Amino acid sequence: MHQAVKGLDKQGFVSIPSRNILLPVYNDAYSDKGLNAGANYANKSVIDPTGEHKPIMGEGNYGLAAHNFNDGQTGFSGLQQYTNHDSPYLQDGHLKGSDWLNGQKILLANAHGIYDYRITGQTLVTNKKISVLNPTQTAQVTIISCLFPSTDYRIITHGKLKNIYTWDNAPRKLVNEFNLKEKNTNAHASWWNPGVEEGANGQKGGTE
């Protein structure tokens, strides 16, 4: 797998097709370097405050974080229902959620295969609420992104695992979501973290 960023360990990719999100996944959600490169696994929880456990795609609670660039398209910006509007997540000081993405796919991919999750809802938490990353018995994905304009809060997008595929037995439609010669990646904004995209809008690389 093409490493792309020196000093970071690429885990694979995340795709949310309904929101045109395709990002590389690295191993450091707690540094500017990691977040400026794309998505990263987030693994510091109440149970594991120093992040000793390395998460595994398709197992337990796989946490992911990326920037919300408040533009509806870069990083995880597309997961906020209305750009630059706290509603429906924060209303009159009350933390709410949203079901606008329920049922949509979250796809993770690494050298072993594709992990097919379905969104079950969104909730809002403060930026200190690391319990959302606590280990779970069931396989799920927990995506963390900032709320705009109230950036002290985090939108949590929850997904449950539905299927695991090897590259050989995965449906062609799912495989195509990670075809970097045809699909654009959306990790970089010129005004914040300029860089070369890995997809058809940049290096046009493959998954090798």
Per-segment meaning from a language model:
Residues M1-E208:
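Solvent-exposed, non-transmembrane regions of membrane-associated and secreted proteins
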